[in-house]
Amino acid sequence: MAQTSRSADLTSGPMLQKIILFSIPLAASSILQLLFNAADVVVVGRFAGSTALAAVGSNGSLINLLVNLFVGLSLGANVVAARCFGAKDDHGVQDTVQTSVTLGLVSGVLLAVVGFFAARGLLELMSCPEDVIDLSALYLKIYFIGMPMTMLYNFSSALLRAVGDTKRPLYCLAAAGIINVVLNLVFVIGFSMSVAGVALATIISQTVSACMVTRMLMKEEGALHLDLHHLGFHMGALKQILLIGLPAGLQSTVFSLSNVVIQSAINSFGSTVVAGSSASANLEGFVYTAMNAFSQAAVTFTSQNMGARKYQNLNRVVLNCLLCAIVTGVVLGGGAVLAGTQLLHFYSSDAAVIAAGYERLRVICGTYLLCGIMDTLASSLRGLGYSVLPMVVSLVGSCLLRLVWIATIFQLNRTPFMLYISYPISWVLTAAVHLACLLVVRHKMRQRGQTLKAA
C-alpha cells in the first residue's frame, strides 16, 4: 500500500510505546478543543457575570445530545479507514475518505438547521432558568451556525488518526485555539458582546481548524488524498461506516439524553448550582479527554490489527490501553479533587458558585477512572467489529440506570449529590458487563480460528 506522508504502522513493534506516542497528541488535541470552551466560560464568567456563565455552561449536554450521533459516524469512518489501511486496501481507503468528508459536510448542515431553529424550544423542555434562557438560546443559535465546519474537522481528523497521524490535527487546533482566545477577549471585553461574542469566536476558530486539516488531506499523496471534485457517497464504504458509526452515535446520543435529564434536574436548583456545575463540568472535561485518548487509541489499534489479521496483538493492545487510562484517571482525577477549589476560582469569584462546583467535582473526578475503564473496553469491542453489543450494554447499564435513579432514588432525597453519584454507579456496572463481553468475544475468536464475525 502507498503510505501517506505521516502514516504509522500500528501492528508491530512495542505496543505500549506506540499507544502512548499515538495518544499524547490525541489527548492534547482534545484538551485544546476543551480550551475553546474553557476560554468561553472563563472570559464570560469573569467579564459578563454569573448569568452569562450559566447560559454558556449549561448548553453542553444539549449540544452533545444533538451532535453526538454524527460524531459517532466519524468514529465509524475511523474504524473503516484503519481496517482498510491495515489490510493495505488502497481502494477501500480512498472510498472511505471521499465518503467520510461528504458525510461530515451533510451532517454539519443538518445539525446547523435543526440546532438553530430548535434551540429555544429544547431549552424550555430542559427547564432552563428564566434569567438564563434568552442568553442560552442566543449562544446556541450562533454556535450551531458553525456546525458544518465542526463536523468537517471531526471527520477529516478521524481519517488522519486512522493511519496513525495524531500530530497534525494537534497543530491545527493549536492555531485555532490561539485565535479563539484572542477573539474571546476582543469580542467580550472590547466589544461587550457577552455570550454572542464567545459563540462567534468559537465558530471562527473551528472554521480555521477545519480548513487546515482538510487542506492536509487534499495535499496527501496516495490513498488518503482528498479530491473535492470526487466528493460523494461510495455505497460500500458508507454501509461500513454506518454499521460501526450508527450504534456508537446512538449510544452517545442516548447518553447525552440521560445527561440532559440530569441537567434539567440541576436546573431546578437555580442559577448558582447551574453555574457551579457548569464550571465543574468544564474542568472534568480535561480529565475525561486525557483518558479518552486511550479509548480512541484502542479503536484505531484494534482496527488496524484486525485488518492486518494480527490477532495475537489484540490482548496487548487492550491491556495497555486500559493501564494508561487507569493511571491517567487516578493522577488527573485525584489532582483535580485536591486542587478543585483553586481551579474553580478561574471560572468564578462567587463563593457560592465555587462551593456548588466542588460538590460535583469531588464526586465525578474522584471516580473518573471507572469511566475510563468503561470507555476503553467499549472501544475495544468496536475495533473488533462488534458495534451493536457495546451500544446495548451502555444504554442499559448507564443510560437506563441513570433515568431510573432520577425517577426513584433522587425523588427520595432531592439534592445535587444524589444526582452526581448516579454517574460512578453506572460506570461500575457498565464496565463490568463490557469486560465480560470482551472476554467472551475473544474466547469465541480463538475457538473459531480467530475468524471475526461482527455482531
Annotated model-derived regions:
Residues M1-S23, A81-G146, I179, G190-L246, ...:
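Short alpha-helical transmembrane segments in multi-pass integral membrane proteins
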Residues S12, L16-L35, A39, L62-L69, ...:
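Residue-level signal for short hydrophobic patches within transmembrane helices
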Residues Q17, L32-Q33, F70-V71, L111, ...:
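Alpha-helical transmembrane segments of multi-pass membrane transport proteins
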Residues L21-D40, I142, A176, S205-S209, ...:
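Transmembrane helical elements of multi-pass membrane transporters/channels
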Residues I31, L35-A54, L123-E130, V186-V195, ...:
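Helix-terminus/linker motif at the lipid-water interface of multi-pass membrane proteins
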Residues A38-V42, V113, G121, F155-L159, ...:
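Alpha-helical transmembrane segments of multipass membrane proteins
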Residues L53-V113, T150-P169, Q263, G276-G334, ...:
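Small-residue-rich hydrophobic transmembrane alpha-helices
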Residues S74, I142-R161, P169-G177, V198-V213, ...:
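Short runs within selected transmembrane alpha-helices of multi-pass transporters and secretion channels
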